[in-house]
Amino acid sequence: MMICLPTALLLSAFVVAASGQEAPAGAGASGAAQAPHNPKDCQAILANNGDQQEALLCQLSESSMLLAQLGALVSEGVERLVQTHGLALEEETNEGDNDMEKRKHEYLRFGKRKHEYLRFGKRKHEYLRFGKRKHEYLRFGRK
């Protein structure tokens, strides 16, 4: 993906406007991963129409730095929205409920109760299907 110079300038203007303050060109989260060229050298290379690969490398380093700053701003904004609307607590409670339901269905799905039917017969609540309670079967001697 190639980002041209006007796009990089628009991104930098957006980042400066969104943050409300001017960030130093050498600072940032991606300062260690930045190309060995500093922005002044990149501007000189672009102005002098130097080597095409160096110019592309400079544009790439500048745009990656701007995208990293933009990503940090977006993640900050999302965190603030989550905190103000209280969405983080609801997601945590829903995850616990889903895990319990999944365990219950896995228990039924893999046939864990089949051997129980063979050993013990039907469970208490299954007698209700036939219209009589378990104690009625025991009391009147019917099976």
Swiss-Prot record:
GO CC terms: axon; extracellular region; perikaryon
Protein origin, superkingdom: Eukaryota
Family: Belongs to the FARP (FMRFamide related peptide) family.
InterPro entries named in the record: FMRFamid-related_peptide-like, FMRFamide-related_np
Name of the featured protein: FMRFamide-like neuropeptides 14
Tissue: Expressed in RID peptidergic neurons, and the sensory neurons ALA, PDE and PLN.
Predominant subcellular localization, coarse grouping: secreted
Gene that specifies this protein: flp-14
Result of knocking out the encoding gene: Defective forward locomotion whereby sustained long foraging forward movements are replaced with shortened forward runs, more frequent pauses and reversals.
Subcellular location: Secreted; Perikaryon; Cell projection, Axon
Positions of the propeptide segment: 21-101
Functional summary from the UniProt entry: FMRFamides and FMRFamide-like peptides are neuropeptides. KHEYLRF-amide has an excitatory effect on dissected pharyngeal myogenic muscle system. Functions in RID peptidergic neurons to promote forward locomotory behavior.
In-chain residues carrying the UniProt-annotated modification Phenylalanine amide: 110, 120, 130, 140
Keywords recorded for this protein, A-Z: Amidation, Cell projection, Cleavage on pair of basic residues, Neuropeptide, Repeat, Secreted, Signal
GO BP terms: neuropeptide signaling pathway
Transmembrane segments: none
Disulfide partners: none
